[in-house]
Amino acid sequence: MARITVEDCLDYVDNRFELVIVGSKRARQIATQGKEPLVAPENDKPTVIALREIELGLIDDAFLAATDAEPVEHFAEPSEENADNLYPEA
């Protein structure tokens, strides 16, 4: 496992606070949303993978905005039978 430093990541992210936000969003995408890592996982945890991607310049805020903009699932429309249950009288 290669050591990743904050200074290496700051070449691609404006400041440490943005690094935390971008890194956590990307780690969450990898861990829970099924997004594929852009680097070989090498048995690393999602947070380390995210920082490695940032260190290599593969991830930035614009990339995250583009990958988060996925279509929203539509909810089922209420049927006539259940319409009375939606808005009960007071």
UniProtKB/Swiss-Prot annotation:
UniProt cross-references to Pfam families, sorted A to Z: RNA_pol_Rpb6
Reactions this protein catalyses: RNA(n) + a ribonucleoside 5'-triphosphate = RNA(n+1) + diphosphate
Highest taxon above the source species: Bacteria
Keywords: DNA-directed RNA polymerase, Nucleotidyltransferase, Transcription, Transferase
Family annotation (SMART domains): RNA_pol_Rpb6 (SM01409)
EC number: 2.7.7.6
Function, as annotated: Promotes RNA polymerase assembly. Latches the N- and C-terminal regions of the beta' subunit thereby facilitating its interaction with the beta and alpha subunits.
Identification of the protein by name: DNA-directed RNA polymerase subunit omega
Organism name: Saccharophagus degradans (strain 2-40 / ATCC 43961 / DSM 17024)
Lineage of source species: Bacteria, Pseudomonadati, Pseudomonadota, Gammaproteobacteria, Cellvibrionales
